[in-house]
Amino acid sequence: MLPQNKDQVLPQTSVLPGRPTWGFSQLVDSSPHNLQPLSPHQGLPPSQPPFSSTQSRRPSSPPPASPSPGFQFGSCDSNSDFAPHPYSPSLPSSPTFFHQNYLSLPRPRASSPSNHWLYPSPPLTPSFSPSQPQNSSLPHSPCQSPSHPEELHSSTLTSPGPSPPSHRLHSNRQTWRWHQYRDTGSGSPGVVERCVPSEKDPAQFRDPGALAQALVVQLGHRRIAHDLRLLLLQHLWLGRTGQAPVVEYPICLVCLRPRSPSCPLPRYRTGPRLLAFPQLLPCVQGQESGPLRIGIGFGLRLPQGQARALHLLPEKRPKEAGPQGKATQACGHQLPASQPPAAQARADPVPGTPSQTRSFRSAGLQSPNSPRCFSGPPPRAPKQVTTSLKPRPCPGPKRPVSLELILQKSSV
């Protein structure tokens, strides 16, 4: 039983002798207004050869001679030798190597000069309605076969640029990375956070440990552990086993966060820093011997004036050590000349503030004895003089102290 439009179907199926017939592919590729609906009981025309199971797949065979029912074949490169003219005599008359129900997805564009796709279409069934064009199943296909078989002689399958499917996949990947970067970041890229003053004044902590703990919470334990691990691996790689790995974070005492470009300039030349370093801790607290674990210690590096302004230094120690420091300085001036400087250093009671002890030690290193013992210039090797243990008499006021004599005595 033939369709009603015999004058339209018969010229399409009549081809040159020795060439394969097109069959239903002409009906699929033709425009919808030229097609008539098929009845459910209508069978295949006698000119259409049935598909056999032995001719279903031949991956190593040459390209198909004629497109099978439900398939569209196209190429995206005009320089390709794999896409000859459909009516070219160089095409062999071999059967198709893909089954009708076999689905092959379009592959992304590679670096080869010619790329080909085999776009599957749903197989022809009795319930197929020709009111919708067959090419609508592939809206993004870059190369589609012409709608009429007469246009095959004049149509060229060329595409100067890359295929749209590969561009679409690449753009989706970039978009996903950009969204991932925006989600992982603290804010939108290129925007600097403002320095908002903290609700709690740093002077209210009155304890360096509490202030350091508040800064650690703002930084995050995971970030500090990651940075410390990288620094430790760097020291091991470079062979710096003698140096302890210490990570320093410049902080802002206005917002109690890591320093940013929007934070005000520090008052002192060396700004406040948070230190993080590894330390060995016992697994069980209070147990001296046993397995150890690696912990993270924290510290603050502040100028002395800023630490006093924030009341982070105890105030009782300078008051108690003030008169004692003055008394020790007075006793040091009244010591006899025969007393060595080592004994003078031992006679020093409990030291006071760091500034007082620093000034006192520097004075003791510069002059091993009291200034009343000799009138000559002070010795040039104070370290060797302070390490000598033998008492030596104070030289006379008219006899200058020679450096050679001091070195000989210290070497003995």
From Swiss-Prot:
Pfam families in alphabetical order: DUF4679 (PF15728)
Low complexity composition bias: residue spans: 50-59, 126-142, 334-350
InterPro entries, sorted: DUF4679 (IPR031461)
Ranges for region Disordered: 1-88, 123-174, 317-412
Biased composition (Polar residues): 1-15, 23-39, 353-372
Origin superkingdom: Eukaryota
Protein name: Proline-rich protein 30
